[in-house]
Structures are given as structure tokens and as C-alpha cells.
Amino acid sequence: MLRKIIRGSGFTQSEEKLIEFADDAFFGLWSYPNVYSDEGYSKNKIGKEVSDLLVIFDKDIIIFSDKAITYNKNKDPKVAWQRWFKKSVIQSCTQLFGAEKFIKDHPERLFVDKKCSVNLPIKIDNSFNFHLVAVTNNISDPAISYFDKIEKGSSATLVNIFPLNAHQCLENPFCVGDVYPDKTFVHILDETALKLLLTELNTATDFIGYLNEKERVVRERTLLVSAGEEETLAAYIMGDKTIISKEIIGNDQGMTIPEGEWKNYKTTFNYQYQLSMKKGSVFWDNLIHNFSTSILSANVGFFSEIEFSTHELGVRELAKESRQSRYYLSKNFKEKLKTTQPHLRTSRMVESIDEPGKFYLFLFFPNDSKLSYSDYRIQRISYINAYAEVA
């Protein structure tokens, strides 16, 4: 039986912004703010928060920690940086590693509310991959001010020097690295980088693909330095989802991504192409959003007796499509709809360009004015079942 799920909404302005970006990319069905465990519930009747935001999609889990620590501009930059870094990054990492361990050890003890009355609806097992993201705030303007003293025109994102661990980052203002190289990689994103990534890579497949590729090149020590997250993103997009190809670099070599890659990318045809893909695939996004909202509100019509996992599995197939594939599917749907006469029943089968062998069946079914809407829906369901069997 499907049950209404009310997700958390964040406790701070920065958390609310993070949730907004995440909902645009992952939709509510896979994005859960303020997830709790039942630790301490027996004593206080309130659970303990595990993460600020938990994204669970297919076999990937992304744990977000959000910190809104003020950077003291009145202090010496090195002193101010160290204080900010300890509270924003090191404390976030501690929270992330703790959340990762708890989720791995006790996935059945996760809840979407602090009263621990509604379990996290997606089942987690030991086959899931974990990605950790530390979201920092209030650092973009100080970073610009600091780097402008070296050279005017620097970007607002932190510099990535990946060989630096947490202790070494403390000694290098506005630089972040692979802070705990012996643990799960932590993506450290300032507010500028977060907005950029979740705007440019606003599908689950595209965003997770970027995290995987970045983790690969850093942990293989192929990428040593990047002038900013936007420069790494530019390399990823222009490299067709590969930041640094193994074919162009030796086994013992590391590369640097210089400043200016993102600005250069925005002048290319590829950038305009990606914008067109987004505009042309809004239909598919809306389709997923509508399904997601209906499932979370338990308003699915005839199928409310079916459990959450079955609904999620079906809609997940729609959401697994990349931006390019969504454009292609949307284009085919709208083209068929445009050429279909209102009184005719027709269909079109379209193959996913992401997953060869995975097909979508679009059925265009006119409403007989003699039928009630309820009867029309029943008839429509029977026809789609029949078409699917033939397909």
C-alpha cells in the first residue's frame, strides 16, 4: 500500500538552497533532506540527524553536508582561512564519514522525520556506491578578494590541489584537496561550484557520472591540480564525459587544468548544444516530476495498492536517461503527438540512446466522449498492456 511521504525542508537558508538545486536535478523521489536515525529516540522521542541531504538513485548514494560558516574578513587571511576550513570542511567530513558508516551498518534505521515514524522508502544494501559532498558557504567573495591580489580576474571557486590533505590545506588559503586520501573521496564544493554543477549536470546520471570520473582521475593521481571546479567541469564536458583520457597521459604523469577552461567552453558550439538539449527536454523532466510528486503524495489513482518500490523502479527508468537521451525521447514524443489526429489511436516505440535494447512505448489514445474519465483510464490501461505484450 502506497503511503504519503512528507520530506524534510531544511533548517537553514543554505540548506533550503541545496534542497532546491537537488530537487531540480534528482526530483523528490530520490532526494531526502534531514534524514534521521533512531539513535536516542527511546530517551528523547526525537531521532538523530544523519545527513543534511541524502540522494539515493539506482545503486548510488550521495551524502551532502551543508555548512554556512562565516569567513572573518577582519582577520589575517591565513588565520581566517584556518578557522573557516576547520568548521566548514573538517567538521563536514567528520559528519559525512559518520553518516556513511551508519548507513552502511544500519540502513534499516533511517527515517525521513525526526519522530522516526516514516522509514526511508528506498531500501539500501551493501551493493551501493557512496559519494560524499561537503557543501561550504560564504567563501566565494573572500576567494575572489584573495586571488585578485595575486592576479585580477580570478574566479570565485576554490582552487583544487588534490595532493593536499586536510592538514596541508590549513596552510594553503583557499585551496582544497583530497583531504582524507585513505577514506571515501570528499567533493568539497563552495556555493558557486554547487550551483554550477547542479545546473549544468541536472540529471542523476550526468551528475553521478561526473562524480565518478572526478574520483577516478584524482585517486589515480592523473589530475593533480585544477584552478577551480568549473575548470574541471569544462574538461569533463569537452572531453565527452572524460576529464583526462588514459590515452593521452603516461602512467606516472599528472595533469593540471588551468584557469580559463570554463570561459573558453562557454564560447563553443558545444555549450550552445547543451543549452538546446536542456530546453528541448523539459517535457521529460516534467513527466518525471509529475510522477515523483504523485508517488510521494500517494495520489496515483488505480495503483495505490502497489508498494513504493514498484512505483519508484518504473519512474527511475525515466530518470536514468541523460540530458541528451531525454532530448531525443522528448523530440520523438512531441513529433508523434503533433502528427496524430485527435480521433486516432496510434503509438510509437523509441529506443533509449543511453541503453541500447531499452525501449519506450508511447501510446496516443483518444478519449471517447461517451465514456466517463474513470472508464477511459481503465480502457487506456488495458490497451497499453496489450500494446506492451505485442511490442
Ranges and model annotations:
Residues 1-50, 55-391:
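Intrinsically disordered, low-complexity Ser/Thr/Pro/Gly-rich regulatory segments
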